[in-house]
Amino acid sequence: MKLGLSSFFIILFFLCGPAYAKEFYKEFNIKVSGIKIGKLIWTIKIDDTYYLNSLKLKSEGFMSAIYRFSGEYYSEGFVKNNKLNPTKYSHVWKTKKIKKNMELTFKNNRLHSLNQTPYEKEKLRVDVFNIKKAKDPITSFLQIILGENSSLVVDGRRVYTMKATFNKKNNKTVVDISNYSNLWADHKRSKFEKITFEKKSGSPLPLKINIYFDGRVFGLEQI
């Protein structure tokens, strides 16, 4: 059963009261081709005015001896008319060879600033600061999980649209990625394709998520 965002806040209000935030915490194994490569911790704090969304992942399993990684993804913002509106987003990605940082701020339903390291010397190919109603990727995904059908995304490297289709028979939602544009040159030609997720009836967050990226499938299974 799909839980709409308005229904979610009604339940949240009656269970917790307007003065208390509800916190959700889940752990997932990360797998590729059935092999565990890491672990993800997902924390959400949300009430009727504010939300915080945090994902932390780290390499685990025997593959970590070959390829070590860690990442942190964070967004926060305000809730208005049952819509999530980001004010800040950041992510950090580390391996043995690289460390990448991205920081975005949002104001008046638009991207306000973009800072990243390593610094990008190329000029922006898209006038991303004048795109209305753009949101960071983890705010967009959370909004879809809670019942919205679509969201316009800017992640600092790309702009794209998430559009969800729910299948009642298998209780699975497919989030297609469309209108895909790179803000800078992508020399690896990598592409974000789609996301699928499954939820248990009455649960606001998924039990299983599959991320289709650059011809590979990254599976997240709740521990």
Model feature map: region roles:
Residues 1-7:
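Positively charged n-region of N-terminal signal peptides that target proteins for export
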Residues 22-106, 143-223:
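Acidic, serine/threonine-rich low-complexity disordered tracts
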Residues 7-15:
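Bacterial N-terminal signal peptides
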Residues 131-149:
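A contiguous pocket-lining binding segment that forms or flanks enzyme active sites
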Residues 17-21:
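Sec/Tat signal peptide C-region and signal peptidase I cleavage site
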Residues 96-136:
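Hydrophobic, well-structured mid-protein blocks that either form specific transmembrane helices
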